[in-house]
């Protein structure tokens, strides 16, 4: 497949909502910056669940966030299509700030910022989460993220991939 250059596609949805599956299914793995993978490199695989309960280390999260933005910035220097695989289930003010950082990077590197929303219901996400690993968010954490996700709106400067009518983002390469 051939992808439009100078495009950043942000995936947005609950854990286990299908974001990483979408990346794999559409052959986007090599074009993806995955927050989870970067966090696992820094903190170790499943670092937050080492003691049988969810314990988030703010230093690991901060470093993973900074490294994700740095990786995106470095990839933008090549002009390549980029997918950012991150839940982005955040309170509205934090989501706005996160998208503003990405928008600023896009402006610097002449990129267009898109998002794809994954509206998978929380019960399905909880079921998938339990099936794939014991190291997944608890129901309480997932429901908190759902509340943020359902009540948040992407800032207007981020284009909606699903409702844009723009089907040229992912183009089949002509032989």
Ranges and model annotations:
Residues 20-80:
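Conserved substrate/cofactor phosphate-moiety recognition/catalytic segment
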Residues 58-114:
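Glycine-rich phosphate-binding loop used to anchor ATP phosphates in small-molecule kinases
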Residues 12-14, 35, 84-87:
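Short His-Asn-centered micro-motif
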Residues 44, 93-95, 127:
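Short glycine-/acidic-enriched loop or helix-start segments at secondary-structure transitions
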Residues 25-27, 47-48, 97-104, 129-132:
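Short, glycine/charged-enriched secondary-structure capping and boundary segments
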Residues 2-12, 17-20, 29-31, 108-109, ...:
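Conserved GTP-binding G-domain of TRAFAC-class P-loop NTPases and closely related GTPase folds
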Residues 37-39, 89, 119-124:
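Conserved nucleotide-binding/hydrolysis micro-motifs of P-loop NTPases
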């Amino acid at each position: 497949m051939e992808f439009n250059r100078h495009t950043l596609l942000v995936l947005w949805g609950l854990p286990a909502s299908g974001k990483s599956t979408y990346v794999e299914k559409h052959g986007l793995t090599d074009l993806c910056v995955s927050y989870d993978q970067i966090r696992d490199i820094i903190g170790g695989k499943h670092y937050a669940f080492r003691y049988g309960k969810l314990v988030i280390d703010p230093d690991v999260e901060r470093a993973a966030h900074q490294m994700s933005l740095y990786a995106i910035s470095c990839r933008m220097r090549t002009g390549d299509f980029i997918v950012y695989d991150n839940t982005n289930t955040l309170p509205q003010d934090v989501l706005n700030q996160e998208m503003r950082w990405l928008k600023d990077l896009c402006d610097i590197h002449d990129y267009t910022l898109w998002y794809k929303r994954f509206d998978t219901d929380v019960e399905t996400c909880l079921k998938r989460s339990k099936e794939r690993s014991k190291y997944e968010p608890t129901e309480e954490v997932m429901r908190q993220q759902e509340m943020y996700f359902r009540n948040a709106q992407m800032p207007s400067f981020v284009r909606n991939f699903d409702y844009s009518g723009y089907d040229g983002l992912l183009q089949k390469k002509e032989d």
